[in-house]
């Protein structure tokens, strides 16, 4: 299959104001997507965004391009990414478009698409849109132009949906929860969901101003959350990322529970309820300890490429429902079609309440292997991972580790870095091995400059 030019592992991403994240390209992308998507007959698309200041600009440009292609646009305003997927599905729209750069700083932004089933677009459709971008932009006849409207009930609809995924027989009454919304898209959703289910909520980073999204807060910066959990003697802390599709949690002692931990807890609860529906999908980055812990409980485990779209693909191939990434993307296809930070955290909270256990208690039985990851920048257009010296260094480390460890070398799908990851039972061996491989990768990268 032809390689995509603009679409990466999570849509189109970049620095605001630079190609392709500028008004001109966004309008052309809206038009191209409108032309491709309208071939299916439905002429309605929903657009949502996170809280970045550039969202207004990109939203308007996308809207103009779609309308020029004859597509009706429904504006959702600031909403979590999974909410946009859900609403596009329930409103029978041809697509949901998300304007967000997830956990990245405010000066980055991105555009990604969900189809009418709430799933990310197939590679084939993305290639069709890219091919249409090469065509000159035209406008449909005036009487066939699209229209724009705003769905003012979007937040209320999604709050009720999230609450409906929490067991009717349970309540969060008596739980004190610190909630970090990353000054992002969950700021007006998650607190309402938790409060209406009975929890005592202490909020942090719930006041977006357009430029503070993910700034020293959220799922990628949990130090403040840890401190606040301890300060307030809270039962648990929850941190979402800027667009609400990732989640990290903190127990009452300040220990961080990442995506691997949460997948383990959710899968174990599902197995206990006789509702697992097969095995669990992780990625090549999932900790070896997760695989071993699940297998010890008789739960099959499979690995996909990195990216929640690939976790989804493998889940669908196997007919399973639960999977996720250590970064905090957690999927449960019985509940929603994409990773949802709020719903994933509700599943963990439900397990705490149902079993009358702390988050710490639920994590017993899963011990992570020591892991070291080093990011090495490289020149775009080159591939140091295929250099003979790098392959030799990897082979040497793999021979030393044997079956008690593993090495992963991969290029990021969103930035020009090679990720060097080593896992093993002994921490010193892990660090030494990762640094050894990274040094060779770096030397090869410099040679290609």
Swiss-Prot record:
The keyword Metal-binding applies. GO terms for cellular component: cytosol. The active site is at residue 102. The modification Phosphoserine is found at residue 102. Its EC number is 5.4.2.10. SUPFAM superfamilies: Phosphoglucomutase, C-terminal domain (SSF55957), Phosphoglucomutase, first 3 domains (SSF53738). This is Phosphoglucosamine mutase. The gene is glmM.
């Amino acid at each position: 299959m032809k390689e995509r030019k603009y679409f990466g592992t999570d849509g189109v991403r970049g620095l605001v104001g630079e190609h392709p994240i500028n008004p001109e390209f966004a309008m052309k992308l809206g038009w191209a997507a409108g032309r491709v998507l309208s071939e299916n007959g439905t002429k309605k698309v929903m657009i949502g965004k996170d809280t970045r200041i550039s969202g207004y600009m990109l939203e308007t440009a996308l809207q103009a391009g779609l309308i020029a292609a004859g597509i009706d646009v429904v504006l959702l305003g600031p909403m979590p990414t999974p909410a946009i997927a859900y609403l596009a599905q329930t409103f029978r729209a041809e697509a949901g478009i998300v304007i967000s750069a997830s956990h990245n700083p405010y000066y980055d932004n991105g555009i990604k698409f969900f189809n009418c089933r709430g799933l990310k677009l197939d590679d084939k459709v993305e290639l069709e849109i890219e091919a249409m971008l090469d065509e000159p932009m035209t406008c449909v006849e005036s009487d066939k132009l699209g229209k724009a409207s705003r769905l003012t009930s979007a937040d209320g609809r999604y709050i009720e949906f999230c609450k409906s995924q929490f067991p009717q027989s349970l309540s969060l009454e008596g739980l004190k929860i610190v909630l970090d919304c990353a000054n992002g898209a969950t700021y007006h959703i998650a607190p309402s969901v938790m409060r209406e289910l009975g929890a005592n909520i202490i909020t942090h980073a719930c006041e977006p101003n357009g430029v503070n999204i993910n700034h020293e807060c959220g799922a990628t910066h949990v130090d403040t959350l840890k401190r606040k959990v301890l300060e307030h003697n809270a039962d648990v802390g929850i941190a979402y990322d800027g667009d609400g599709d990732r989640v990290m949690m903190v127990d009452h002692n300040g220990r961080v529970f990442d995506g691997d931990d949460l997948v383990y807890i959710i899968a174990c609860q599902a197995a206990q309820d006789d509702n697992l529906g097969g095995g669990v999908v992780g990625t090549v980055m999932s900790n070896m300890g997760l695989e071993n812990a699940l297998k010890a409980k008789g739960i099959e485990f499979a690995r996909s490429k990195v990216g929640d779209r690939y976790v989804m693909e493998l889940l669908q191939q196997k007919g399973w429902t639960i999977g996720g990434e250590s970064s905090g993307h957690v999927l449960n296809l019985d509940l929603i079609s994409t990773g949802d930070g709020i719903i994933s955290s509700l599943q963990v909270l439900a397990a705490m309440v149902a079993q009358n256990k702390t988050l710490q208690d639920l994590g017993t039985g899963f011990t992570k292997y020591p892991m070291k990851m080093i990011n090495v920048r490289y020149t775009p257009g080159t591939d140091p991972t295929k250099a003979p010296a790098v392959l030799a260094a990897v082979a040497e480390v793999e021979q030393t580790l044997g079956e008690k460890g593993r090495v992963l070398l991969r290029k990021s799908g969103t930035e020009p870095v090679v990720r060097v990851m080593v896992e093993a039972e002994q921490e010193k061996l892990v660090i030494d091995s990762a640094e050894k491989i990274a040094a060779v990768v770096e030397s090869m990268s410099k040679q290609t400059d």
